[in-house]
């Protein structure tokens, strides 16, 4: 880089080609020796929050930024050389093309630094970039000089020179629109003609005789394979465009040796690919437009439904052009597509079939969306959800096992809930009676589903110190009443309350339990800690459990669960205990206190084990009958 000071008064540097794992701390450690840094920002993707592989480093002084640009450009950070240039905030200057040159036919070994070192002698460089893909250099690059004069010097000296044994082309940078306009202008004055579909018996001489009548030809070539046999196409280069145009007009579509030949303007590979891409996109758009309102997406299909059954289910609503159940490994993926002949038929099918039970499952039927449309919709929905979350500061989503109140409670004052309400709101275990894992939000209150408003932790379930204590003697004596009303200790305390106090009423809606309506109306009940006592073992309280290390907590609960389960199912006690220990600790504490709740969960676990054993027995019987060895 020339010692001349750049014309940019800013002290901000653009740092590109970063490794995805590079952090602001790494960049600070790298650039701080150059001088005081005001800020560093790695630009990130809005959706994934992943690095966009470039950053801005803002120095306090311009001379420090220039020193970093001179000494640190192309230094390696996490195995990748970084590309540094002045930050240009004005997009019109970045895209003007002034001082920007294009270099092509570069050797694969030429990287950003090698190209930078080669062209730095011609002037002050703002940016130097060799275009690469996953396979390395694509053989061309761009160099942006500070001045137009420096770019002209580079073009004059470098165009046609040998670089690593290859002759490079260096020219003024042109935008895509300019290049396409030039190609279009040249296409109208074409001298070269492309001929195809003339068979294998054609050679250069015969092709020259065939097209020589239209005018003088500079060259004629029939393309051949390794054995010298014609590939069925070739080229003729005329001296004048008029002769080439005449050959195309007269020969295109004529029959030659029983075949209809094609004669047209010879195109470069890039032109042909662009034209084919444009044609394909047009066909794709036409197909999308045609099927946009007649193609239906059907999901939640029963495993036994195939293409024929899907067609039969939807055939009463109109003419079906196609019906397809998506498969993977010979098994249904649970969704498919049905295409009707008219929008009216498709609309009627959506109205009638959405929610209808076919086989054993209710169907979901809607108009099919393209992948891009669906991704755009989901992205928009995600951004709206994130915006609503950011609008409520200092709030987090409650973890599984915490319950949200419909009305915020008075600070430091928690309401008392009967055990029956707690039991209904407790999280389900990770296994069910059918042996399937439930959805993470299955059976949860609607208030804590994804997308619902979030609340501070201060409004969550009451602290353990406020849960009424029930001694083991009371628990045994009042087993039959514990799941239908307040616990005896709380009931006795409430009975001793003066009659002038109003007993609070609760309103339970949508599975969400509410706090008491008025603080003054709450009975003055002294809450004590929940205690669980098992014969021959030390009393286990919630605070004692919480103070133990996480790995010790399950052990403490397991030691108290095992003897209780062993009394019910001596042979399966070990397996059942292991299954129950997957449940949340607060649920396990409640189960230790409530024999009914424990027995219910034990019965579910036994049902799961029996179903699993029956399945294994059936599989063994099938394997024995078919001669397949059992593992």
From Swiss-Prot:
Which positions carry Dimethylated arginine? 501
Q: What does this protein do?
A: Binds the poly(A) tail of mRNA. May be involved in cytoplasmic regulatory processes of mRNA metabolism. Binds poly(A) with a slightly lower affinity as compared to PABPC1.
Q: Where is this cross-link: Glycyl lysine isopeptide (Lys-Gly) (interchain with G-Cter in SUMO2)?
A: 361
Check the record and name the InterPro entries matching this protein: Nucleotide-bd_a/b_plait_sf, PABP-dom, PABP_1234, PABP_HYD_C, PABP_RRM1, RBD_domain_sf, RRM2_I_PABPs, RRM_dom
**A Gene Ontology molecular function term of the record:** poly(U) RNA binding
Q: In what residue span(s) does the RRM domain sit?
A: 11-89, 99-175, 191-268, 294-370
Entry-annotated residues carrying N6,N6-dimethyllysine: 361
Which NCBIfam families does the protein's record reference?
Answer: PABP-1234
Q: Which residues form the PABC domain?
A: 537-614
The entry assigns this protein to a family as follows: Belongs to the polyadenylate-binding protein type-1 family.
Q: What disulfide bonds does the UniProt entry report for this chain? A: none
- Provide the protein's localization: Cytoplasm
> What protein does this entry describe?
Polyadenylate-binding protein 3
A Pfam family hit: MLLE
Query: What is the tissue localization of expression for this protein?
Result: Testis specific.
PTM annotation (Phosphotyrosine): residues: 140, 364
